[in-house]
């Protein structure tokens, strides 16, 4: 079941993937949950893959309340600072990556353009 969920989420998130936010070619993100099976994200260049289980050598380990919180953080519908402050999100490892991952799959905000006329 987790394997299918990860495949479905990958397909949903692929159009929004922005690897330039990481400022590195490779990263391994381990997601551990208070409730729910662990999984990890491997980023290699311009590709990514979510896999069930634990990574061999994660670049960073993210401790998250549950799967729903994780997906909400990744798609930008939940603020990372709020999740951190309420104890739903913390990290061990390369802490800079704990912030950059929050923008890795974020959907672009609509842009507004204004024209000023005299």
What are these regions (language model features)?
Residues 1-118:
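Feature captures hydrophobic
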